[in-house]
């Protein structure tokens, strides 16, 4: 069924490559097990890596492309964390919860469809995570196909991407890890077509939590990929939130645009999480209005009264039943998907899987394990471990620039003055730092 050298299924831990030395049972997140990725002390980034340029930045800090020194010629992505701040003033109060979670989880995780952490390097007032370098991500690939004179992402490529993504997700869920921020930008793709689930900054363990997951992080998952139970204010949630996001990604790979592209309502000054009215409207327009018949638990959701109000005010514009199949058929037609086209087609099996991923009721939503056994993957020939196999086009390399404050200031790791761009300001706490 699967192509040669493709991962095989193991009931304990998911799918693993054949003959690569993985044990038959899943690597577990056992605190008694010595971490495969240790914390490196008394080593500076510039001693081991040559910085090529700047990739991106975010709330966490900055990411750089690097090449190994001392005979190690592989490429790496180095994530440099910002210090925590009190207001606008650098206080060096420690690392964020997100950074600590990402470091602790990535140090233990080991799977071919999850991004590989090489090492963690601690420097004075600065910390770096060194990852394998991936040349692409799904957002970049989707954007490439939206350009004029370009066509739909071939159906076999979509199938391989989705299989590998679910494969990595099964491994995470089997080891009690929720990702909680799956979206195209966080799904990395190597130059050889291997999928890596990346950016575990919002990930967390969900085995017997002391408090509800909501109490720790009130807002999770980027709005367009946020599951309806989260939008409805659920105080506790399950791995099903990740599967909804996979459904959104599947739809986006086919249509080349987000299926539920709503506008996010921001939290107020009291950090109260608002009802995401616009996003819920976008979902209802395609999926129909959720009722207690199709989702019995919805009536007990904190935002149920808000949903009722929304339904009453927008009643003439809402479908009472799902419009997903019409959306899907229109998507296939507009994308040129058919059995006779070069793009191929995901067919009826593709729609069935999509509808089970985008199930309103999280208790009925398909799991990663069930999805991997779905006819969409069982039928239709072998699945390639290289999602680019058979694709004649070329995707552009990831953009790497010199346009970054660290590079201009000489504080980039690998230059003479390594560390944060503001490390020279220690002792001048009144100085405010521009972002």
UniProtKB/Swiss-Prot annotation:
Which Enzyme Commission numbers does its entry carry?
Answer: 2.7.11.22, 2.7.11.23
Chain ranges of the Protein kinase domain: 49-377
Keywords assigned by UniProt, alphabetized: Activator, ATP-binding, Kinase, Magnesium, Metal-binding, Nucleotide-binding, Nucleus, Repressor, Serine/threonine-protein kinase, Transcription, Transcription regulation, Transferase
Catalyses:
L-seryl-[protein] + ATP = O-phospho-L-seryl-[protein] + ADP + H(+); L-threonyl-[protein] + ATP = O-phospho-L-threonyl-[protein] + ADP + H(+); [DNA-directed RNA polymerase] + ATP = phospho-[DNA-directed RNA polymerase] + ADP + H(+)
What is the annotated localization of this protein?
Nucleus
> Cross-referenced SUPFAM superfamilies, in alphabetical order?
Protein kinase-like (PK-like)
**SMART domains reported in the protein's UniProt record:** S_TKc
Q: Which residues bind ATP?
A: 55-63, 79
Cofactor or coenzyme needed: Mg(2+)
* GO process terms (BP): negative regulation of filamentous growth; negative regulation of transcription by RNA polymerase II; nuclear-transcribed mRNA catabolic process, non-stop decay; positive regulation of transcription by RNA polymerase II; protein destabilization
**Comp. bias intervals (Basic and acidic residues):** 398-407
Q: Which residues form a coiled coil?
A: none
Pfam families linked to this entry: Pkinase (PF00069)
Q: Where is this region: Disordered?
A: 398-435
Biological role stated in the UniProt entry: Component of the srb8-11 complex. The srb8-11 complex is a regulatory module of the Mediator complex which is itself involved in regulation of basal and activated RNA polymerase II-dependent transcription. The srb8-11 complex may be involved in the transcriptional repression of a subset of genes regulated by Mediator. It may inhibit the association of the Mediator complex with RNA polymerase II to form the holoenzyme complex. The srb8-11 complex phosphorylates the C-terminal domain (CTD) of the largest subunit of RNA polymerase II.
Subunit record text: Component of the srb8-11 complex, a regulatory module of the Mediator complex.
Could you identify this protein by its name? Serine/threonine-protein kinase ssn3
What species does this protein belong to? Aspergillus terreus (strain NIH 2624 / FGSC A1156)
- What gene does this protein come from? ssn3
């Amino acid at each position: 069924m699967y192509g040669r050298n493709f991962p095989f299924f193991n009931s304990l831990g998911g799918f693993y490559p054949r003959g690569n030395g993985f044990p038959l049972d899943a690597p577990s997140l056992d605190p008694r097990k010595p971490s495969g990725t240790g914390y490196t002390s008394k080593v500076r980034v510039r001693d081991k890596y040559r910085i090529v340029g700047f990739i991106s930045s975010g709330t966490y800090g900055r990411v750089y492309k690097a090449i190994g020194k001392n005979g190690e010629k592989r490429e790496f992505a180095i994530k440099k964390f910002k210090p925590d701040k009190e207001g606008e003033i650098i206080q060096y109060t420690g690392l964020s919860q997100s950074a600590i979670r990402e470091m602790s989880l990535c140090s233990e995780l080991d799977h071919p469809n999850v991004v590989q952490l090489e090492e963690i390097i601690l420097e004075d007032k600065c910390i770096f995570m060194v990852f394998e370098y991936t040349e692409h991500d799904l957002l970049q690939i989707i954007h490439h196909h939206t350009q004029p004179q370009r066509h739909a992402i071939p159906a076999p490529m979509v199938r391989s991407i989705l299989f590998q993504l679910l494969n990595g997700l099964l491994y995470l869920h089997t080891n009690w890890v929720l990702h909680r921020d799956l979206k195209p930008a966080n799904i990395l793709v190597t130059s050889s077509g291997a999928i890596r689930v990346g950016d575990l900054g919002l990930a967390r363990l969900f085995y017997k939590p002391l408090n509800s997951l909501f109490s720790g992080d009130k807002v999770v998952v980027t709005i367009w990929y946020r599951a309806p139970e989260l939008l409805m204010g659920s105080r506790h949630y399950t791995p099903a939130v990740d599967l909804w996001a996979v459904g959104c990604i599947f739809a986006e790979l086919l249509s080349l645009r987000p299926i539920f592209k709503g506008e996010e309502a921001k939290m107020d000054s009291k950090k109260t999480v608002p009802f995401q009215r616009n996003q819920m409207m976008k979902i209802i327009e395609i999926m129909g209005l959720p009722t207690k018949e199709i989702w019995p638990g919805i009536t007990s959701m904190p935002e149920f009264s808000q949903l009722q109000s929304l339904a009453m005010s927008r009643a003439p514009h809402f479908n009472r039943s799902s419009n997903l199949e019409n959306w899907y058929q229109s998507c296939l037609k507009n994308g040129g998907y058919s059995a006779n086209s070069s793009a191929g087609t995901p067919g009826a099996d593709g729609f069935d899987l999509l509808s089970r991923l985008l199930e309103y009721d999280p208790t009925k939503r398909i799991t990663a394990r069930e999805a991997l056994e779905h006819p969409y993957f069982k039928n239709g020939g072998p699945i390639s471990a290289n999602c680019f196999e058979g694709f004649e086009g070329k995707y552009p390399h990831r953009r790497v620039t010199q346009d970054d404050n660290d590079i201009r200031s000489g504080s980039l790791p690998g230059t003479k003055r390594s560390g944060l761009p503001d490390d020279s300001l220690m002792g001048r706490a009144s100085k405010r730092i521009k972002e």
